[in-house]
Curated annotation (Swiss-Prot):
InterPro entries per the UniProt record, alphabetical: TMEM242
UniProt entry tagged with the keyword Transmembrane helix: yes
Record keywords: Membrane, Mitochondrion, Mitochondrion inner membrane, Transmembrane, Transmembrane helix
Topology versus the membrane: Multi-pass membrane protein
Ranges of the Mitochondrial matrix topological domain: 1-27, 99-142
Protein name per Swiss-Prot or TrEMBL: Transmembrane protein 242
Mitochondrion is among the record's keywords: yes
Length: 142
């Protein structure tokens, strides 16, 4: 093996390492942003509920003799189970599609999806020639 081939194979392995590192960092970033969004949305919802009716909000925090479980703990339990069902459902759906298509890597999946669905035009000329969408036609009364 010559020096040029050795340096070329070293450069290729460096590129692969950089791609893996970039993919991991991107996944961590997306997970962080999604988690922050969920926490912010849940917190904002609680803040609005407390602002609208503080008496009812405080009654829901503490359990009573009539209702042994507080509304807040019931809501948190429902949020937990709903999140679990959503994660498992999306994972199962993704796995089913993956296996049904018979692909073995993300590259194969991408190629298969590109062969099934039409390409999305990236240039502005194609968008300029298309008919603009009219929202008023949808909401117009008959």
């Amino acid at each position: 093996m010559s020096v040029e081939q050795a340096s070329a194979s070293g450069a290729v392995s460096d590129i692969v390492e950089d791609d893996k590192s970039h993919l991991i960092k991107g996944g961590a970033f997306l997970a962080t942003v999604a988690t922050a969004g969920m926490i912010a949305g849940f917190g904002a919802t609680l803040a609005v509920a407390k602002k609208k009716s503080p008496d009812w909000f405080n009654k829901g925090i503490i359990g009573s003799a009539a209702v042994p479980e507080s509304g807040a703990s019931l809501a948190l339990r429902a949020l937990g189970w709903g999140s679990l069902y959503a994660w498992c459902g999306v994972g199962l759906l993704s796995l089913t599609i993956w296996k049904a298509m018979g692909v073995h890597s993300l590259q194969e999946f991408r190629q298969k999806m590109q062969s099934i669905f039409p390409a999305i035009p990236k240039n502005e000329d194609a968008q300029a020639n298309s008919v603009p969408f009219d929202w008023n036609s949808i909401f117009k009364s008959k």
